């Protein structure tokens, strides 16, 4: 908390149009004295009149990895916007405000703390995620770089857990979202549904033990992408692919793969591999081509061999949406919402 506040006061507040800063993400669920999970960073949201003045960044301060994300002050103009947007409602309800020169964040905190768990707003946030998934459109096909097919599939599967986590009043933006949704489903009497969600990502016949060799390829492409330079310097997620973040991006994923619920590692393997390939696509297409067989091998291990398989996974996700809705209603009913 102190390092994040020092960062907000010492650096971010110097930028024009600064309106405040607060903590977000999984750190808000920790009790006093709890250690931050290995591989996690501390999310610091910086509010500006124009968020374009400050770039999204990751940097180490006092042994903590801070992820700084700018947001527009307009997002906090009224309680309704905050309460219907999960990542705003969760953070404002918890109210870990670092700096609030205008008093706006404190006001939104008081409103969110009172209303964010009401049935109306739980359902509105749940419905927002379901709408996002149902309107995701046709995923890019073979005329785009392979990583551009991987990203919407992997993130779509991850977001499929969000309506359920939202209904249970849990944070969605957690590193181990499939583990989190498994705990919720177990608690609310629907344990069998977890396998339906994870299958969107892993397929039905994946072999967790066989993922280890793909971790070696992920490590290699990460190191190669870290060493590249060129147009990717201006890409938003380039700050995620740096030598200083090796343990966060690769080491933490390897530890999850070796845990009792390795499905969460698959999401991060795909997301990180795709980001590394985007860096190489921008900077060094020869290196990108050299790692393409490794990405194809990882996809094949998950049952993805071409465009038809991506399309089938999207259809599988769309078909599951009514059941996700039904599960969330069951959870809300049990919670008296």
Question: Where are the predicted features?
Answer:
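Metal-dependent nucleotidyltransferase catalytic core
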Residues: 1-19, 26-96
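Conserved nucleotidyltransferase catalytic core and NTase-mimicking acidic/glycine-rich helix/loop elements
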Residues: 122-337
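Internal, well-ordered alpha/beta segment that forms a basic, Gly-enriched binding/recognition surface
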Residues: 73-141, 147
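Short N-terminal helix-initiation segments at or just after the protein's N-terminus
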Residues: 6-11, 95-106, 212-217
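Short hydrophobic/aromatic-rich motifs at helix boundaries and adjacent loops
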Residues: 16, 27, 105-112, 153
């Amino acid at each position: 908390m102190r390092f994040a506040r020092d960062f907000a006061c010492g650096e971010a507040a110097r930028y024009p149009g600064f309106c405040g800063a607060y903590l977000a993400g999984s750190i808000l669920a920790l009790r006093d004295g709890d250690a931050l999970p290995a591989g996690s960073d501390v999310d610091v949201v910086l509010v500006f009149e124009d968020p374009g003045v400050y770039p999204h960044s990751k940097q180490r301060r006092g042994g903590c990895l801070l992820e700084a994300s700018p947001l527009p002050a307009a997002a906090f103009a009224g309680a309704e916007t905050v309460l219907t947007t999960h990542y705003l409602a969760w953070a404002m309800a918890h109210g870990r405000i670092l700096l609030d020169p205008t008093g706006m964040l404190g006001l939104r905190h008081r409103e969110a703390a009172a209303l964010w768990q009401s049935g109306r707003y739980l359902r509105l946030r749940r419905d927002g995620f379901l709408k996002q998934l149902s309107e995701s459109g046709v995923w890019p096909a073979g005329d785009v770089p392979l990583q551009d097919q991987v990203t919407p599939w992997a993130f779509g599967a991850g977001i499929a857990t969000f309506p359920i986590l939202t209904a249970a009043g849990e944070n969605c933006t957690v590193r181990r979202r499939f583990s989190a949704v498994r705990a919720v489903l177990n608690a609310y009497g629907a344990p069998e549904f977890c396998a339906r969600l994870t299958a969107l990502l892993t397929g039905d016949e994946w072999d967790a033990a066989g993922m280890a060799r793909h971790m070696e390829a992920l490590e290699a492409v990460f190191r190669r992408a870290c060493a590249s330079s060129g147009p990717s310097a201006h890409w938003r997620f380039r700050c995620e692919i740096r030598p200083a973040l090796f343990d966060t991006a690769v080491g933490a994923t390897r530890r999850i793969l070796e845990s009792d619920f390795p499905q969460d590692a698959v999401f991060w393997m795909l997301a990180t591999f795709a980001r590394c390939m985007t860096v190489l696509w921008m900077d060094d297409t020869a290196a990108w081509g050299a790692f393409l067989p490794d990405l194809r091998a990882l996809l094949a291990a998950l049952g993805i061999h071409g465009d038809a398989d991506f399309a089938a996974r999207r259809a599988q996700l769309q078909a599951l949406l009514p059941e996700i809705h039904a599960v969330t209603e069951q959870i809300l009913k049990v919670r008296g919402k």
